[in-house]
């Protein structure tokens, strides 16, 4: 079963308790791209206190850790914008 944006949103909400969360399926923008056959492309905008004091790489690691069980199920690409609530 293919991963949906709802699957991603649920996993991130449970792991990081974000104050803002937007998940967009960008797969249609990559039609014909070799990786599009093997998985889907998503963009995530997330604001969470869990990111406070962390560098961008550590923030992205938290997001990837939260999605670890979904990654092998069909996420080919993930664009991440991770901030604290007061950084927006």
Give residue ranges: language-model regions.
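A short interface-forming secondary-structure element
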Residues: 38, 46-57
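N-terminal first-folded block
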Residues: 2-35
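Solvent-exposed beta-strand sheet faces enriched in polar/charged residues
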Residues: 24, 45-47, 81-83
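C-terminal structural segments of small proteins and small subunits
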Residues: 54-88
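N-terminal/domain-start segments enriched in small and hydrophobic, helix-friendly residues
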Residues: 1-5, 10, 48, 66, ...
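Histidine-centered active-site/metal-ligand motif
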Residues: 30-33, 41, 60, 76
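A generic structural signal for short beta-strands and their flanking turns/coil linkers
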Residues: 17-19, 38-42, 74-78
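Residues within mature, well-folded domains
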Residues: 29, 49, 85-87
């Amino acid at each position: 079963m293919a991963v949906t944006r709802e699957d991603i949103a649920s996993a991130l909400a449970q792991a990081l308790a974000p104050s803002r969360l937007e998940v967009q399926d960008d797969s249609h923008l990559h039609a014909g791209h070799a990786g599009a056959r093997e998985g889907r492309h998503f963009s995530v905008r997330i604001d969470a206190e869990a990111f406070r004091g962390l560098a961008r790489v550590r923030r992205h690691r938290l997001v990837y850790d939260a999605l670890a069980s979904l990654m092998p199920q069909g996420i080919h690409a993930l664009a991440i914008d991770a901030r604290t609530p007061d950084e927006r």
